[in-house]
Amino acid sequence: MRLTVIGGGLAGSEAAYQAAQQGVTVDLYEMRPVKTTAAHKTGELAELVCSNSLRAKSLENAAGLLKEELRKFDSLIMKVADQVQVPAGGALAVDREAFSQKVTEYIENHPNINLITEEVTEINESQPTVIATGPLTSTSLTERIQKLTGTDFLYFYDAAAPIVTYESINKNIAYWASRYGKGTPDYLNCPMTKEEYEDFYQELINAEKVPLKSFEKEVVFEGCMPVEQMANRGKDTLVFGPLKPVGLENPNTGEMPYAVVQLRKDNREGTLYNLVGFQTRLKWPEQRRVFRKIPGLEEAEFVRYGVMHRNTFINSPKVLTANYQLRERPGLFFAGQVTGVEGYVESTASGLVAGLNAARKLQGNETLTFPRETALGALASYIVEASPDNFQPMNINFGLLPSLEKKVPKKIKKQKQSERALKILEEFIERKL
């Protein structure tokens, strides 16, 4: 019983771990560091190339529910994230380097996993395989997958935010607070007056951007939209978006700022901070010039500039089943952002389901289709039931889950949906596993 997993990102690492935990021998292929991508910086597994946040912890948030469901299956990614988390108020954020290093250690030390660092350019259709090559799939493998699925790849762009050193932030201006007072005050906040914001806004929308290739249409995912593109929607868009000041009163003045830029810890030591919501494709000198206009960041030292990259994904509703298996070729599974799920936790979830099912298929057991009342099942259902004519990446959200049978007050509806999901998942586990 041998399973091939192609791609050592979040989905591939989770898929390999889940299958290995079922007693299956796994060959996990990762091309880095032999061959790298435009977005990756290291050769470690499960490298986080965008934010260091796995989003909300609360069960009143769908991402919080999905994380809790993953923990029920001893998810490798969740286990490591919980071990290396950094303070981030109501969110689960991690030390970026420690996270990928620890995932790599778990994989390398697992007796049932062989980690092979080389590029895969062919897919053996007779060999049970999980394809988790990510949104930056290499050209040669993209062509092979297109032949397998019989469809062209779709694509969108997303971007990463810059990171600055803690010591270069002016703490006489920036202050600690968490929005609405939720959790501990783990965010550094840079306040802006109306005049400061308007000056910053003009510089931002007029700054030079890295051009796209002339033949490529600019399609961006809302959750990773460049800050300058968001600003172009209107002068107040940022003030009602990532720069909203609500709940962040400035203790130095006792007043509510006109706008606030939040910075979140990027490593456990607290020496690095990322600019929350500042994904960008501005040219690097422009990032330094424009972002130093933010009060408190006048002397900011940038250790990583924001970058933008092209993400590709298959038209899953045309080709996949709800257990992430290729309809026309049983035994071949897809997982991660290449399927059209969007986000770290969502990629992990698809890897978990694909890895479990690949192992079960190898062992001659029935594959699992998760109940759609669960976050795991709702996400998988979206992937196969969305319109193939306009298929777009999707984060987990309560809108994907069925309505409650009984009407409840709006303020407790999400909590009740989470309670139902976890109860149904427990019953599903007892019945099927």
Swiss-Prot record:
Its main location: cytoplasm. It is found in: Cytoplasm. GO terms for cellular component: cytosol. The keyword Cell cycle does not apply. Keywords: Cytoplasm, FAD, Flavoprotein, Methyltransferase, NAD, NADP, Transferase, tRNA processing. It catalyses: uridine(54) in tRNA + (6R)-5,10-methylene-5,6,7,8-tetrahydrofolate + NADH + H(+) = 5-methyluridine(54) in tRNA + (6S)-5,6,7,8-tetrahydrofolate + NAD(+); uridine(54) in tRNA + (6R)-5,10-methylene-5,6,7,8-tetrahydrofolate + NADPH + H(+) = 5-methyluridine(54) in tRNA + (6S)-5,6,7,8-tetrahydrofolate + NADP(+). Its cofactor is FAD. Catalyzes the folate-dependent formation of 5-methyl-uridine at position 54 (M-5-U54) in all tRNAs. FAD binds at G7, G8, G9, L10, A11, G12. Its EC number is 2.1.1.74. Belongs to the MnmG family. TrmFO subfamily. It comes from the Bacteria. Transmembrane segments: none annotated. GO terms for biological process: tRNA methylation; tRNA wobble uridine modification. The keyword Cytoplasm applies. This is Methylenetetrahydrofolate--tRNA-(uracil-5-)-methyltransferase TrmFO. GO terms for molecular function: flavin adenine dinucleotide binding; tRNA (uracil(54)-C5)-methyltransferase activity, 5,10-methylenetetrahydrofolate-dependent. It comes from Natranaerobius thermophilus (strain ATCC BAA-1301 / DSM 18059 / JW/NM-WN-LF).
